[in-house]
């Protein structure tokens, strides 16, 4: 591994002085050396995008099928073990509505005209998400292009400035944005390159332990020693919540991407009002009126509740995540994200484990 980083500025806040990429690289190497561990596949998602692909390709290869015959061929595939017949019925009705599937006079199903256009594209059988370019516009000005745009409310850097995303038009591949001040935080919400919680926990251990790693070069050893000193003084390696002065706080949850994303949404949607929380953003300090004890009490109380995962989807949000999500009903896209992508159970376990800090 080669990690490049800019020298932290003298007035940089504590979280930005820790070499996160270096810690991640160490964690990956150590997990393999110590446990022969590699990140496991995610087999319990709700892959509605892949379900669309398999449905259309099955009809294209076999010809007319009854709904029952189609369900028997597709839903019995092991990867779809969490998808119910009711969900499949919702998908089929939607595909008929948008003409990707057509109903014959005998009640059978065949590929529709719109579906034919998708199938005849040579890229159809590549089921993984491509890097498709989106045009970024602000009012009448075209700013440039990006790939994999973040959802509304997140920030992007383009044309030498920072912009907040107002709307994403997935059909026209256009992002509408408004210029704001500030820098762009590291965004990793809706990208496929997720990080497992086990990696983050090993990163924390690397920050706290005094072990030397023989594969590190001189500069890396020096940066690691500096980071360990910073963590020891600040408590970053042992305390999840640290006050940076006044009402400015930083939270170190040490969670993987999708448990982290669930925690961020829980705080914004369910806890922000009671905690006086504002400015919560990945990799940036946030502002909170409540004290440390209240923070953990409120978070644990919300984590204990038996809420519907769909409550962690923002109002009006349709979190397109996979290649063919745009052809899936919005209700299934939201359900697939809330119940199949967000690691709510991992988030709850971590939130409840912080009770002792309250």
What are the roles of these predicted feature ranges?
Residues 2, 131, 169-241, 295-358:
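Terminal, basic amphipathic appendages of nucleotide-handling enzymes
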